[in-house]
Amino acid sequence: MDAPRRFPTLVQLMQPKAMPVEVLGHLPKRFSWFHSEFLKNPKVVRLEVWLVEKIFGRGGERIPHVQGMSQILIHVNRLDPNGEAEILVFGRPSYQEDTIKMIMNLADYHRQLQAKGSGKALAQDVATQKAETQRSSIEVREAGTQRSVEVREAGTQRSVEVQEVGTQGSPVEVQEAGTQQSLQAANKSGTQRSPEAASKAVTQRFREDARDPVTRL
């Protein structure tokens, strides 16, 4: 497990029987308004690491400004990189209370910002998913409609083709067959009757010619 991290600009706590306050980083000397007895009663605040970084910066770069304006000293231990951080506030009791109140107000503000951003992202995801669902439904519906139209048009075209074949085939063929049959029958009948009629006509004529001389005598 990694050792607790201390920001480079934070006050080093005085150990029991110990040594005067040592200020690290950007604070090279002790504050004139800070007294060593303030180290005995720190106020402790626990916050999520990401909130501490939002308030004081990732490396604690805003802490010197807060300390100078509030006349307090701040020590931060990051207990768990993904969990909580411990903030110790040293100074006059009234200044401690004001500083802790300010820290908690800033924490609430950043929580609200994160919740708002998460809610906006969630709403955007829902809207995107809804739009995709509607688009898929429209595409499926249009594909089904187009398929129905194609099937209906194919059926109609097939019916027209069948009707045209039936209409053109039956009446024309029947009429042509009937006409041809009538002509053949008439021709045959005429061919068969002509020799008989001619023979009868010749016979009748010879008979008449045979009677005429007698009648004339």
Curated annotation (Swiss-Prot):
Its main location: cytoplasm. The modification Phosphoserine is found at residue 182. The keyword Cytoplasm applies. Gene3D superfamilies: K Homology domain, type 1. Component of the subcortical maternal complex (SCMC), at least composed of NLRP5, KHDC3L, OOEP, and TLE6 isoform 1. Within the complex, interacts with NLRP5, KHDC3L and TLE6 isoform 1. The SCMC may facilitate translocation of its components between the nuclear and cytoplasmic compartments. Forms a scaffold complex with OOEP/FLOPED, and interacts with BLM and TRIM25 at DNA replication forks. Interacts with PARP1; the interaction is increased following the formation of DNA double-strand breaks. Interacts with NUMA1. Component of the subcortical maternal complex (SCMC), a multiprotein complex that plays a key role in early embryonic development. The SCMC complex is a structural constituent of cytoplasmic lattices, which consist in fibrous structures found in the cytoplasm of oocytes and preimplantation embryos. They are required to store maternal proteins critical for embryonic development, such as proteins that control epigenetic reprogramming of the preimplantation embryo, and prevent their degradation or activation. This is KH domain-containing protein 3. The lineage of its organism: Eukaryota, Metazoa, Chordata, Craniata, Vertebrata.
